[in-house]
């Protein structure tokens, strides 16, 4: 399993990379706006430079099909390791099918059903991103969707990789790994929480107290 960071914050990415466990980044218009960034291309290229061997997803912002196609072509030129994020819509599928044949890699995002994931794989998407947290918020079982997609992809030999997205807490990461998702994209806060455990903290405190007691 691989871990991606779901952020457009350069400092968070640098900190995450120092841990040696992050191999990709996903961004979207909301994350970029959160950072007050107006030059999307520049920040994506910065991120791509930080992870020359990693996958960096950058999302289109257009809704008109012709403009979506234009943006997808443009984003694909930003860096060798950029992946174009495109919504799971009929228009998105058409663009994935067309440009994947030209070597453009796509991350089909906002996936909320097995059928969407199936069609994305058939169209040639390199990645598909089921949104676990948002499904949970709506009263559905987000992890069951991940499990079903992984099972179907395995059954039919699809090479499309599953990115468990909309991760809200460390348990989501555990569950994603258990279901066989190849990737989980997580906020920096969740990444750090994954390494935390109260027994680790208390164990360190006990060891240090014992060591100091024999140094007197």
Swiss-Prot record:
This enzyme's EC code(s): 2.2.1.2
BP GO terms, sorted: carbohydrate metabolic process; pentose-phosphate shunt
CDD domains: Transaldolase_FSA
Catalytic activity: D-sedoheptulose 7-phosphate + D-glyceraldehyde 3-phosphate = D-erythrose 4-phosphate + beta-D-fructose 6-phosphate
PROSITE patterns recorded: TRANSALDOLASE_1
Top-level taxon: Bacteria
Family: Belongs to the transaldolase family. Type 3B subfamily.
Name of the protein: Probable transaldolase
Taxonomic source organism: Dehalococcoides mccartyi (strain ATCC BAA-2266 / KCTC 15142 / 195)
Gene this chain is encoded by: tal
């Amino acid at each position: 399993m691989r871990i991606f960071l779901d952020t457009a914050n350069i400092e968070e990415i640098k900190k995450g990379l120092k841990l040696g466990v992050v191999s990709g980044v996903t961004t979207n218009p909301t994350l970029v706006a959160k950072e007050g960034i107006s030059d999307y291309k520049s920040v994506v290229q910065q991120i791509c430079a930080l992870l020359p061997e990693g996958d960096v997803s950058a999302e289109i912002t257009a809704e008109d099909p012709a403009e979506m196609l234009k943006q997808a072509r443009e984003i694909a030129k930003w860096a060798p390791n950029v992946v174009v994020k495109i919504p799971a819509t009929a228009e998105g599928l058409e663009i994935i099918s067309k440009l994947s044949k030209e070597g453009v890699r796509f991350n089909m995002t906002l996936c909320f059903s097995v059928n969407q994931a199936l069609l994305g794989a058939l169209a040639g998407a390199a990645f598909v991103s089921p949104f676990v947290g948002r499904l949970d918020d709506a009263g559905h079982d987000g992890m069951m969707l991940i499990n079903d997609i992984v099972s179907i992809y395995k059954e039919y030999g699809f090479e499309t990789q599953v990115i468990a997205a909309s991760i809200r807490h460390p348990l989501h990461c555990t569950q994603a790994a258990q279901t066989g998702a190849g990737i989980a994209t997580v906020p920096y806060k969740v990444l750090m929480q994954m390494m935390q455990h109260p027994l680790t903290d208390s164990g360190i405190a006990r060891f240090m107290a014992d060591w100091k007691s024999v140094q007197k």
